[in-house]
From Swiss-Prot:
The keyword Endoplasmic reticulum applies. Residues 1-677, 723-802 are cytoplasmic. Belongs to the TRAFAC class dynamin-like GTPase superfamily. GB1/RHD3 GTPase family. RHD3 subfamily. Keywords: Coiled coil, Endoplasmic reticulum, ER-Golgi transport, Golgi apparatus, GTP-binding, Hydrolase, Membrane, Nucleotide-binding, Transmembrane, Transmembrane helix, Transport. InterPro entries: G_GB1_RHD3_dom, P-loop_NTPase, RHD3/Sey1, Sey1/RHD3-like_3HB. Residues 782-791 have a biased composition (Low complexity). Residues 757-802 are annotated as: Disordered. This is Protein ROOT HAIR DEFECTIVE 3. It comes from Arabidopsis thaliana (Mouse-ear cress). Its main location: endoplasmic reticulum. One of its GO terms (molecular function) is GTP binding. GTP binds at residues 44-51. Residues 760-781 have a biased composition (Polar residues). Its EC number is 3.6.5.-.
Length: 802
């Protein structure tokens, strides 16, 4: 393989060989050299032996002129090759010769363009000239030097280029004598070249380092020529070191940008524009650094480690996220630094910053996802820890504070692990969001817990007050409301004390705490008021129950039997008085221990003013009930208005009137059932009309004995048959019942008499006593049976539901 890799850089028509240059750089591995490379070019008249010199000096294989075929143009355009065996890497450019007949005298454009290109690209420019031209006014090298100096004015280069004049076919004149003459000629040419105003007085030494070497004739003294070339070759080793031939490196572009830089320079030169090398260097650095940055960005996106990390973050927090991502980012930035290290520092740094910003912009959503996972995890941990702390019985505020501090501390630690070295991202907003979420959860839990506590103590108050208040109102009397007030005060204090102790762990402000306790007290009061309103709605039923209880039961709570001895008027008055007492108790709410005259007003208006003969005073009192409010009672405390009381009392009297009437009827019926004597007129008639029969009995006492025996038998049958009891159920049922019992009873009685008659005479007295005792016993049994049988007749049913 050709080690020099000779390649045409620019053809004779001025076309830049892009693919050829890329192939050349790849073959000679120029892009790996960084800034450690040098470019040497050679100028000179056509057929002056430039290619021959380069081939011997640098080991290249440029095409040389065949002298046997005549002198003609050999090199067309610009060729490039690598020097063999010289370090650092040295690239040689062989330029088309000047003053060639092929282009003619007027076609000097390519000469100037190639000269300008060589000066812009090269560190060292060899100017090949004949020894016999030194000192001549019309020498062949003067147009070349004028061209070099003229184009130099268009470069604006910050560095000095080494111009090495190679004197060919040296004569016997010593070099020490030739060099001053050559330098003088060079200075004259420099002075004659038009310059910009800024460089009118600028010496040649500010632009060029001038070196002069002489070589013997290759054709006449080949061995001496080769020896001199070998010695010259040694000067190109380490040429880029300080003090070397190419020691000024200020305008050098990195080797990996050489092809792009050369192409852009040639394009500017062809467009006949001034070539500002510093600006060109910046441009090259900008383009190449941009390309490198884009490559590294694409490489980062395709990085397997980054993809795995990004995918892992989607499912949850990743341990060591910041460290892993920082390592991947640093690797990409380090690769950029390695490839862009030789470019303009300001451009390199700027593009590096842009690359870093793009990379950070790419990874920031993933970083935010990590923060989101950390925040969600911290919030969930807080909720669990907070719930466990509350279940363990710890104070609400202390639990909330300790759990919040612990979870936020863990979140901060997670953020520290997630933050990457290359970015100074602020996690405070996420932290603030977490704090707000925690505070919102604490607030919601506090609200729920306070609601639970309130509900708990309200339910306790419901249980403690509802039943007892209902029972107290059911037995309404003068002590009802004092007992209710006492109950309300006791249960309210217990509930407030319990709630106050429960609230101590919440660290509430005093105003809120006092309001909650006051609300609980009001709730307890509301329970009593609500229950009182419910009972007031059932006032009529309660009054009728009270009336029925007192009217139908005696002082021993035994059912009352209307035997005819009871004072129904007094009992009715007592029962209605008790019902009126109940109405007065239920008329208003008395939780503030305030005095009122409701009972007195109702008594005067409703109880004492009965009948149609009411006095004018009573009428005035009744009129006082024609109002919707009670005197000295707030409307909100009124349960039953005076007008409603009047209406209720009227309805009450109407519905209880039937019960009283039933009692009176039962009493009258009982009296009739217990009175067996005929009316007085019947007794008088019996005396008048039965006088003769009575006298007959007196005249014949035997009839008295018969009547007495008949009386005893009748009495025994009366008792045995329970005639009065049977007829209490009705005449027809009584007759049917007696008809079935009569014969067995008579037979039983006769049997007993027969047994008495068969008794021994000695026991006559005993028999008489036994008979009397049996009669008494029979009477007692009959009486008892009569009593039990007559009981239903005496107990007249009372309709209390009316």
């Amino acid at each position: 393989m050709d080690a020099a890799c000779s390649t045409q850089l620019i053809d004779g028509d001025g076309v830049f060989n892009v693919s050829g240059v890329d192939h050349f750089i790849k073959e000679v591995k120029l892009d790996e050299c960084g800034l450690s490379y040098a470019v040497v070019s050679i100028m000179g008249p056509q057929s002056s032996g430039k290619s021959t010199l380069l081939n011997h000096l640098f080991g290249t294989n440029f095409r040389e002129m065949d002298a046997f075929r005549g002198r003609s143009q050999t090199t067309k355009g610009i060729w490039i090759a690598r020097c063999a065996g010289i370090e650092p890497c040295t690239v040689v450019m062989d330029l088309e010769g000047t003053d060639g007949r092929e282009r003619g005298e007027d076609d000097t454009a390519f000469e100037k363009q190639s000269a300008l290109f060589a000066l812009a690209v090269s560190d060292i420019v060899l100017i090949n000239m004949w020894c016999h031209d030194i000192g001549r006014e019309q020498a062949a090298n003067k147009p070349l030097l004028k061209t070099v100096f003229q184009v130099m004015m268009r470069l604006f280069s910050p560095r000095k280029t080494t111009l090495m004049f190679v004197i060919r076919d040296k004569t016997r004149t010593p070099l020490e004598n030739l060099e001053p003459v050559l330098r003088e000629d060079i200075q004259k040419i420099w002075d004659s070249v038009p310059k910009p105003q800024a460089h009118k007085e600028t010496p040649l030494s500010d632009f060029f380092n001038v070196e002069v070497v002489a070589l013997s004739s290759y054709e006449e003294k080949e061995e001496q020529f080769k020896e001199q070339v070998y010695n010259l070759r040694q000067r190109f080793f380490q040429s880029v070191a300080p003090g070397g031939l190419a020691g000024d490196r200020r305008g050098v572009v990195p080797a990996n940008a050489f092809a792009f830089s050369a192409k852009q320079m040639w394009q500017v030169i062809k467009d006949n524009k001034d070539l500002d090398l510093p600006a060109h260097k910046v441009m090259v650095a900008t383009v190449r650094c941009e390309e490198i940055a884009n490559e590294k960005f694409s490489s980062f996106i395709a990085n397997e480690n980054w993809r795995e990390l990004e995918e892992a973050v989607q499912s949850g927090p990743v341990s060591g996220f910041g460290r892993k991502l920082s390592s991947i980012l640093q690797a990409s930035l380090s690769e950029y630094d390695t490839e862009a290290t030789y470019f303009e520092e300001s451009v390199r740094s700027s593009k590096r910053q842009q690359l870093q910003e793009k990379l950070l912009q790419l990874v920031q959503p993933t970083f935010q996802d990590v923060l989101g996972h950390l925040r969600a995890g911290a919030l969930e941990n807080f909720k669990n820890a907070f719930e466990k702390a509350l279940d363990a019985g710890e104070g609400f505020s202390s639990s909330a504070k300790s759990c919040a501090q612990s979870c936020i501390s863990k979140f901060d630690k997670g953020c520290e692990e997630a933050v990457i070295e290359q970015a100074k991202w602020d996690t405070s907003k996420t932290r603030e969001k977490l704090e707000r979420d925690i505070e919102a959860h604490i607030s919601s839990v506090r609200t729920a817990k306070l609601a639970e506590l309130t509900t708990l103590y309200e339910s306790k108050l419901n249980v403690a007050l509802s039943g007892p208040v209902e029972a107290l109102l059911d037995g309404a009397n003068d002590e009802t409301w004092p007992a209710i007030r006492k109950l309300l005060r006791r249960e309210g204090e217990l509930a407030v004390y319990g709630l106050s102790n429960a609230l101590s762990g919440f660290e509430m402000d005093e105003e809120t705490r006092s309001k909650m306790l006051a609300d609980l007290e009001n709730y307890a009061r509301g329970i009593v008021e609500t229950k009182a309103k419910e009972e007031a709605g059932r006032a009529m039923m309660r009054m009728k129950d009270r009336f029925a209880t007192i009217f139908s039961h005696d002082s021993d709570s035994m059912p009352r039997v209307w035997t005819g001895k009871e004072d129904i008027r007094a009992i009715t008055k007592m029962a209605r008085s008790a019902s009126l007492k109940l109405l007065s108790v239920m008329a208003v709410i008395r939780l503030d221990d305030e005095l009122d005259n409701i009972e007195k007003t109702l008594t005067l208006a409703l109880f004492n003013s009965t009948g149609n003969n009411a006095t004018s005073k009573s009428i005035s009192t009744i009129d006082s009930l024609a109002s919707s409010t009670w005197e000295k009672v707030a409307p909100e405390k009124t349960l039953i208005t005076p007008v409603q009381c009047k209406s209720l009392w009227r309805q009450f009297k109407n519905e209880t009137e039937y019960t009283v009437t039933q009692a009176i009827s039962a009493q009258e019926a009982n009296r009739r059932n217990n009175n067996w004597l005929p009316p007085p007129w019947a007794i008088l008639a019996l005396v008048v009309l039965g006088f003769n029969e009575f006298m007959t009995l007196l005249r014949n006492p035997l009839w008295l004995l018969v009547l007495f025996v008949g009386y005893l038998v009748s009495k025994a049958l009366w008792v045995q048959l329970n005639i009065s009891g049977e007829f209490q159920n009705g005449v027809l049922p009584g007759l049917l019942s007696l008809s079935t019992k009569f014969i067995p009873t008579v037979m039983n009685l006769l049997k007993k008499l027969a047994e008495e008659g068969q008794a021994p005479p000695t026991n006559s007295n005993q028999s008489m006593n036994s008979t009397a005792q049996s009669e008494v016993t029979t009477n007692g049994e009959s009486s008892s049976s009569s009593s039990s049988g007559s009981s239903p007749a005496k107990n007249v049913p009372i309709d209390t539901s009316a």
